[in-house]
Amino acid sequence: MAKIVKVIGREIIDSRGNPTVEAEVHLEGGFVGLAAAPSGASTGSREALELRDGDKSRFLGKGVLKAVGAVNNEIAGAIVGKDASNQAEIDQIMIDLDGTENKSKFGANAILAVSLATAKAAAASKGLPLYAYIAELNGTPGVYSMPLPMMNIINGGEHADNNVDIQEFMIQPVGAKTLREALRIGAEVFHNLAKVLKAKGLNTAVGDEGGFAPNLGSNAEALACIKEAVEKAGYVLGKDVTLAMDCASSEFYNKENGKYEMKGEGRSFTSQEFTHYLEELCKQYPIVSIEDGQDESDWEGFAYQTKVLGDKVQLVGDDLFVTNTKILKEGIEKGIANSILIKFNQIGSLTETLAAIKMAKDAGYTAVISHRSGETEDATIADLAVGTAAGQIKTGSMSRSDRIAKYNQLIRIEEALERAGTPAPFLGLKAVKGQA
């Protein structure tokens, strides 16, 4: 038994200078797990609650002492003495103790930090790397794959202080044979994009996720700049590198008139018009994945978009599904989208995260493991991507150490599996829905 003997919560600082929750779980035998909760900027309305103190005299109201207090008191009191290797039981104890639908009593930030720290401690007690332990929890021991990175190299929307409406323009180094080669290709395109932007007299400052955040005339101009950078780096767009976008459409959807208002371009679209706008971009550029291409509440619009684009483009639900199996189940039944973005702080525990990934895969949907715009050095999502053989990961650009921490962990994992004589496959474009 991997008996929990101590649980410690603390307030640490994330990549945006805001507090977040870190938890330590100590086991008999001296094994320790340490994990921190991430934080989002553009959030789905049905996400589990991130508990903030609201005390304007501390961190502008963003303190997390209440959540930390829950870790050190109620949660610690309930799980000390329990077996850390029973992840589902530990998570359920915290969920039941919280007693709310959206984890608003203790905060998903408190529950998740303890959930992940518990898994790390249990993995250490078994002498397993975290990805291997996650594969065991997932019911797929020894089944791994290295994920195709979706690298957010131009930031807009809520992730940047610029006039670009679409939140993320991403590259996928699909021509790579390994994760390490994919990162090299991504880095080379990133550095060439800096040169392209500089030559145009555009800003090369970076946004929350490490991508550039220039003011551009249109979303198409962002794609054109990336195309030029790919070619300058010596690669072929559509063969070596494909494109993906996160529209984060809820951020520019006007609920009063039902229009998608792209202020940066000075254009307004109905739901169906916006789908056809995206369809045109897909005809002009090799865009193989679109995230949140409609407002989270516009299920009729999503159904239409899935009908129009779903057989040739991966349509990822982020704000749409919020890593929630109840919502995902309804989406699957109604034929909404064909992929889910997995952010474990949207649901608030590792067990529930694994359930969402399994439900998606069983239904023929893909699962894209994702960071949040507010991150720390915690690299658990790298192990989650490998240990569930998800096939795809979104963890930012080729700058900011909070993003690079995840890529470096993937490098370590890929190398460790190769040295053990059990290399994990890198599926490239085959991992993307509709592209196999």
UniProtKB/Swiss-Prot annotation:
The gene from which this protein is expressed is: eno
| Lineage summary | Bacteria, Pseudomonadati, Pseudomonadota, Gammaproteobacteria, Pasteurellales
Q: Tell me, how does this one assemble?
A: Component of the RNA degradosome, a multiprotein complex involved in RNA processing and mRNA degradation.
Give the highest taxon in the source lineage.
Bacteria
Gene source species? Mannheimia succiniciproducens (strain KCTC 0769BP / MBEL55E)
Q: Where in the cell is it found?
A: Cytoplasm; Secreted; Cell surface
Matches recorded under SUPFAM superfamilies = Enolase C-terminal domain-like, Enolase N-terminal domain-like
Q: Which Gene Ontology terms of cellular component type are present?
A: cell surface; extracellular region; phosphopyruvate hydratase complex
Residues binding (2R)-2-phosphoglycerate are 167, 343, 372-373, 394
How is the co-factor bound, per the entry? Binds a second Mg(2+) ion via substrate during catalysis.
Name under which the protein is recorded: Enolase
Q: Name the reaction it catalyses.
A: (2R)-2-phosphoglycerate = phosphoenolpyruvate + H2O
Active-site residues annotated for this sequence = 209, 343
| EC number annotated for this UniProt entry | 4.2.1.11
Q: What is its main location?
A: cytoplasm
**What sort of enzyme, by top EC class, is this?**
lyase
Instruction: Kindly state a single biological-process term from the GO annotations of this entry.
Output: glycolytic process
Q: Which metal ions or organic cofactors does this protein require, according to UniProt?
A: Mg(2+)
